[in-house]
A protein has these predicted regions:
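Acidic two-metal-ion nuclease catalytic site recognized across multiple nuclease folds
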Residues: 132-175
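Extended hydrophobic/Leu-rich segments
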Residues: 1, 22-23, 120, 159-161
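Metal-dependent phosphoesterase core characteristic of DEDDh/y 3'-5' exonuclease domains
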Residues: 1-6, 11, 27-140, 145-149
Length: 175
């Protein structure tokens, strides 16, 4: 089911709860792992929790039991703030960098198949390539630091241990 296309889903007759149970089976199969997203804290993780709740399934499946969350959108934003040349971005009318995957992909990886933009598989490929680019750039220290805060426990330990801890917040296109 994962990345097999919308056609397969349309031709099946799964109910919402059957689909959610199947998704939870995949989560169990792949766990424990670090669930990595682009804007997951703003969309993916929230959606999964709400739909799991509606289906009477465990709502924190992807961040308990050894699982952790990582959202690379804030990592990319922080990297661009401190190392402006690490990613090529277009600029919005309000003079802010644009961090949409279907914009970042072609700007940074011209060989991407543009016919697949904003599909699950293309978003995954673009996310992976952005992560690799950040890891291999001057922003690698931000990339590495992001891995230290993928769980509540590790984030708390890091914050309590360090004398200085920096985080970046993003509001309406501004850091």
């Amino acid at each position: 089911w994962v990345n097999k296309g919308f056609d397969r889903m349309q031709s099946s007759n799964l109910s919402h709860i059957e689909m959610m149970k199947l998704l939870h089976q995949y989560i169990d199969k792949w766990s424990p792992c670090i669930w990595t997203t682009w804007n997951g804290f703003g969309f993916d993780f929230v959606l999964l929790q709400k739909e799991s709740y509606k289906s009477l399934l465990p709502i924190y499946k992807t961040n308990l039991g050894g699982n952790e969350h990582c959202d690379f959108l804030p990592v990319a934003r922080a990297s661009k703030l401190f190392f402006p040349d690490c990613l090529n971005t277009d600029i919005s009318e309000k003079k802010n960098p644009i961090f949409k995957l279907d914009n970042l992909g072609p700007r940074n990886f011209p060989d991407l198949d543009k016919t697949k933009m904003h599909t699950a598989i293309q978003d995954c490929e673009t996310l992976l390539r952005v992560m690799k680019k950040l890891k291999q750039s001057k922003a690698s220290q931000i990339y590495e630091a992001s891995k230290l805060t993928t769980s509540k426990l590790s984030a708390r330990e890091k914050i309590e241990k360090e004398r200085v801890f920096t985080t970046c917040f993003y509001f309406y296109g501004k850091m």
